[in-house]
Amino acid sequence: MIDDQVIAAARGDIPCDLVLKNAQIVNVFSGEIQKGDVAVQGGKVAALDSRDAKITVDLEGRFLTPGLIDAHVHIESSMVSPYQYARTVILHGTTAVIADPHEIANVMGVDGVSYMIQAAEGAPVGIFYAVPSCVPATHLETAGASLETKDILPFLEHPKIVGLAEMMNFPGVIYRDPEVLAKMNAAKSHRKTVDGHAPGLSGADLQAYLAAGAASDHECTTPEEALEKLASGMRIMIRQGTGAKNLNDLLPIVTEQNSRRIMFCSDDRHPYDLLEKGHINIMVARSIRQGVDPVTAIRMASLNTAEYFGLRDRGGIAPGMRADLLVVPDLVDFHVQDVYSGGVKVVEDGCGLPSPMDPPPRPQTSSMNVDVDGLDFTIKAGSGKARIIKLIPDQVVTAAMTGDVLQKNGEALSDPGNDILKIAVVERHKGTGNIGLGFVNGFGLQKGALASSVAHDSHNIIVVGVDDADMKAAVKAVADMGGGLAAAAGGKALSVCPLPIAGLMSDQPMEQVRRQLDILMQTAKELGAKAEDPFMSLSFLALPVIPELKITDKGLVDVNLFNFVSLFE
């Protein structure tokens, strides 16, 4: 809606709410850095010029840039609610994000997506959503819900929904699965974007995927892959998350000719990284240090994303655009000093200012339908060698190994001396009683157990341990607190991190979650865990779409065969 007061302020007929003077304005439209003033009225930029104002702030030559935008993120990976997430990323200059609520949708379906939209209202960051396209991800596990075309149609009418989220089922696209194509057609008929997800896809299959309308990809890991997709018309989101870090590898592809087709995203970023390292701002800073033109780097983090998703009033500093503005002392470190969101200062000297809004209530739907007393992690002894999941450090892929396992009194047992531990996935959504059982190598636990209700993509409870009693204690702790992470030994929980929102997120500030995680990680290390973040490693072992051997509540999955295999050969 046109605000006539903004027009009046732009003409100088009335005083503006705010003028930021003596700025070096990063103009992402012209590619220049211009000395000047910015007048703000009613939350929008009124003029790139000096005006009478109720409040005047002298920036004394500091840089003024557009707010940064994350092109693709799963807020659930931050382990906090959308409101608490926004409190953290605004400190780093992120004023808008495009979030895919895929994780909570796998647990709560339509209600989960609705919660995420509602929980973002009033946050200092503009949180927009792409409706999940692949819920559940596969038939090889029990999800809490499913989203069909009829379920996503109402969301496509919502003003906060800007597209269809990453279409992970690229085989379904290229082999013309009717339901997959129906979802894409629904998005296109509503003039929404269709985000892609096509790791390694090339040649004729890539062309077929693009012919269906997939428009972007955040899964590129090599320059060759990204350049082929750019040349074929795709937009590329360069990703720098907690697990997947592609910035250094992909920055060399950025040129003056192709930079308008490139954006920045985080995908999955955990509390420690968000609090201690930063967000999209660190991608901008590193890009500039590695030789990307500063205005180009900032444009990739703002205007490119806004234009792709149709956010016409965001991404730049110009009359009529939303006054999402960053004050930055220099463009090398790109340390964000002050942040204005809709013309209101929300960050001053790097610190968040108090917000009058109370966080929204968390959803009341239970997602812990587990008969803890009936849990049985017994594995009967087998006659052949066992198939064992082998962890690969710092990777979400695993290897498949075979070997002898410890057997006694007709049972197959954990063998911590050889780093072979029991692993189980307990179905938590529908009370089926399903328990998938197997063995894993590489965790290093010498005693105790670790359990988590964060287990991609269906987020059942996954547990690894040395003995059954501790595995049961860890699962009980997770179930009793409505979801979360737990470390147990001696038949009791030693430390926990509650995640009561769908078993994925906390309703507490990120700083508190980070403290709980620090204690939990220390406990895991004391039990012998070798990985830097054993819970992150654990969370991907139930994902049956990433090779090579994984486990779900239905059993052991050979991902290359895309089918179940027996535990013993």
Swiss-Prot record:
Q: Which cofactor does it need?
A: Mn(2+)
Q: What are the UniProt keywords, alphabetically?
A: Hydrolase, Manganese
Q: Which Pfam families match?
A: Adenine_deam_C, Amidohydro_1
Q: Which reaction does it catalyse?
A: adenine + H2O + H(+) = hypoxanthine + NH4(+)
Q: Which GO terms describe its biological process?
A: adenine catabolic process
Catalytic activity, EC = 3.5.4.2
MF terms from GO for this chain are:
adenine deaminase activity
Keyword field contains Manganese: yes
Q: Which residues form the signal peptide?
A: none
**Which Gene3D superfamilies does the record match to this protein?**
Metal-dependent hydrolases, Urease, subunit C, domain 1
Q: What is this protein called?
A: Adenine deaminase
Source organism of this protein record: Desulfatibacillum aliphaticivorans
Its gene is ade
